[in-house]
């Protein structure tokens, strides 16, 4: 039995029936499909075949800012009523690498705060590298290769996440330099080839001491391996440092029982919105002063753009909304600068 959905490569729930009356009692040398005692009685789709992005954006006007934010959090499985406004923004920030191209996010903090949940369970376009281990060839492709592996993971995924930065080890001595090139420009050289990709990079890890003690003895990037810790230029390419110690540890009350978007819809929404750029909304009301160098401005703009695409996809933002997101974006970039 072939259902029309099989041609669309979709997922569904099938109910099988026993077609005993259809069985042929005659002995056959070769059995055909008609001899099967089973048939598909019904099929219920459980995955969206496509997303009407404009229709979804149009629905934004019927929600207040907080209602839309809460809907996004519930769609990711979280219960916003258990979170403060700052905590809710932290959880939304975790989604920015999924909706903003070439975005570099670092989140370090205590264990058990659900750092990898978004990238493992919510989006099929993100890959989680367990233990933070990979190779240069796996991440950036093989030199002078004409095969599909020429571009590596950054060319095949929207987001590449290292779930334990302490385990990041590369045998290739040029790996850190290649990663810096990619994080800065979205391109890198492999042999004779110059390759472009738009995957975002997420670096996650654990801080096993209090932040106060860490700052007294070292810095907030300490969990990274020595080959990274000795290179401040690498950290300067990180757009936002998400303070994991400000996020509550996961507990049953943080898991929502309310309705939200199905994950297919949320992930497709993020993927489609990656093509858009909302950075120009900053310039309607604000200008960067001389305290911001070029990398600072790029980092803040990209964080702002990602948050704005998530929370204001219809671009209906007033000055207070822009300032709200801009303040949050600057805070995360300042945390990076203070460690350099």
Task: Please describe what each predicted stretch is.
Residues 1-75:
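Extended, charged/polar low-complexity intrinsically disordered regions
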Residues 47-51, 157-162, 208-209, 214-217, ...:
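Short acidic (Asp/Glu) and glycine-rich catalytic loops that position anionic groups and cofactors
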Residues 72, 95, 179, 266, ...:
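Short amphipathic C-terminal alpha-helix that caps PH/PH-like domains
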Residues 79-213, 218-222, 236:
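Conserved ASCE/P-loop NTPase catalytic core
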Residues 93-95, 189, 224-229, 252-255, ...:
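Short secondary-structure capping micro-motifs at structural edges
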Residues 172-176, 196-198, 228-235, 259-263, ...:
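Amphipathic alpha-helical transducer elements in NTP-driven molecular machines
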Residues 215-249:
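A short helix-turn-beta junction within AAA+ P-loop NTPase domains corresponding to the substrate/partner-engaging
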Residues 239-340:
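Conserved NTP phosphate-binding and transfer environment spanning the P-loop NTPase/kinase superfamily
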